[in-house]
Amino acid sequence: MARSNLPLALGLALVAFCLLALPRDARARPQERMVGELRDLSPDDPQVQKAAQAAVASYNMGSNSIYYFRDTHIIKAQSQLVAGIKYFLTMEMGSTDCRKTRVTGDHVDLTTCPLAAGAQQEKLRCDFEVLVVPWQNSSQLLKHNCVQM
């Protein structure tokens, strides 16, 4: 009878030994981020603001609108550590009175562009995925999905 429990006891002892052999850091800090884990961020975080600017600039370059859009509200922001940092942003955007021209290209300070009013006004709610690689000083819009509000 005692021998039939021996493999179970040895297995449990092995599991306990493995858990005790883990480095103290692996056991003591479960609140730290792991690679690939999504992390909620404040919309006011300066890095979130930079990622949002990059997303809006890329959106404006690819958009067929004759007017620029700018973000009006960052609803939700998350990041994921990959080969760089992926930002997942949910934002509201509004059309502005600033027209796209070949002269200005994409070098317009959108904060100086007033939001459009009346019939010209267009509001969007967008989900953006932006990859920022700080050591290469680059950002890339990977995905976006916008719907009219």
UniProtKB/Swiss-Prot annotation:
Superkingdom, taxonomy of origin: Eukaryota
Main location: secreted
Tissue-level expression: Restricted to the stratum granulosum of normal skin, the stratum granulosum/spinosum of psoriatic skin, and the secretory coils of eccrine sweat glands. Low expression levels are found in the nasal cavity.
Listed InterPro entries: Cystatin_dom, Cystatin_sf, Prot_inh_cystat_CS
GO CC annotations on file: cornified envelope; extracellular exosome
Site (Reactive site): 36
Entry keyword annotation includes Metal-binding: no
Subcellular location(s) per record: Secreted
GO function term, MF aspect, one: cysteine-type endopeptidase inhibitor activity
Disease (UniProt): Ectodermal dysplasia 15, hypohidrotic/hair type: A form of ectodermal dysplasia, a disorder due to abnormal development of two or more ectodermal structures. ECTD15 is an autosomal recessive form characterized by hypotrichosis and absence of sweating except with extreme exercise. Skin is dry from birth and eczematous lesions may develop in adulthood. Other features include blepharitis and photophobia.
Protein name stated in the entry: Cystatin-M
Source organism of the structure: Homo sapiens (Human)
Gene that produces this protein: CST6
